[in-house]
């Protein structure tokens, strides 16, 4: 079956010489077409080959969280599919969940280009996209059309971000409007106050600013849908502890750790080839390997602070089985990937899932849930 994967890789997962954003847009449009015409030829055949090549199932990886069934713990992180154009196809790539967005109440074009870069020396990405998206209303329409064609096969989350034009003091109503437009079309929702690419957004992580947002969403959430919070890796331990306490107060379903980092410490890349500027002068968040250790440290801290009572989705620097296992044993029940998937290719998901089953057998564990947080037990 992997004979199909070889030609698909250079088509869908671009070479290091290509324009990252242009190639990304091409891929999303291609996947959208395959999903829309999934019952026609050749799209039906292509989809069957994708599923045969990249999917892996084992009952030892199945978990139930928030009343949702996750066939495996490995998900697609927010940022890859901002407008939900591939929402119906991510399960075919073997993912156990997919998070769409970030989406804002108001449509916005994002920051000027170029704004998406790869740092191959560091196995990292640099992005300053600025939450470019078509807005919550359009995303709701897209998802309604997608779910009318076929039911979703994996849990779908939506990452909610503040619109750039909305003043910080009106952030709560902005998040609520997005949630109100989208609440019928996804399985869980994420409050994103940690992107470094929306001016002032990270200020909303402070307790005084975050509490009104969580309170407003809590009031709006009559159906008690899972609400999670995505946090920055650049917070200090005191701020993290405050956020954990707020998560308990407002009964958040979980915490996603972490978003991208503004730190440039330890990077091998000194100059960004696309601009010729010193990497330290370039705005944006770093993803991938440089984020790996810090995100795992934060996962472990949250797990300890909550005694494992608040589920954690771990994201940041996952490329291999060992990367995934480290985050699970630190306390993550679910995982998300983005940069690692770009560098390693679409078979990364299957390889990691097969490896997790082998790890469970080696450790004498009968189910993945038994591995969550065992580094601290």
Swiss-Prot record:
List of residues binding substrate: 82, 127-130, 192, 197, 259-260
Reaction(s) catalysed (UniProt annotation): (S)-dihydroorotate + a quinone = orotate + a quinol
InterPro entries assigned: Aldolase_TIM, DHO_dehydrogenase, Dihydroorotate_DH_2, Dihydroorotate_DH_cat, Dihydroorotate_DH_CS
Cofactor note: Binds 1 FMN per subunit.
Cofactor (UniProt): FMN
Any Gene Ontology biological process: 'de novo' pyrimidine nucleobase biosynthetic process
Top-tier EC class: oxidoreductase
Name of one Pfam family that matches: DHO_dh
Keywords: Cell membrane, Flavoprotein, FMN, Membrane, Oxidoreductase, Pyrimidine biosynthesis
Keyword Oxidoreductase in record: yes
EC number(s) reported in the record: 1.3.5.2
Cellular compartments annotated: Cell membrane
Role played: Catalyzes the conversion of dihydroorotate to orotate with quinone as electron acceptor.
Entries under NCBIfam families matching the protein: PRK05286.2-4 (NF003651), PRK05286.2-5 (NF003652), pyrD_sub2 (TIGR01036)
PANTHER family in the record: DIHYDROOROTATE DEHYDROGENASE (QUINONE), MITOCHONDRIAL, DIHYDROOROTATE DEHYDROGENASE (QUINONE), MITOCHONDRIAL-RELATED
Family to which the UniProt record says this protein belongs: Belongs to the dihydroorotate dehydrogenase family. Type 2 subfamily.
Entry protein name: Dihydroorotate dehydrogenase (quinone)
Native species: Gloeothece citriformis (strain PCC 7424) (Cyanothece sp. (strain PCC 7424))
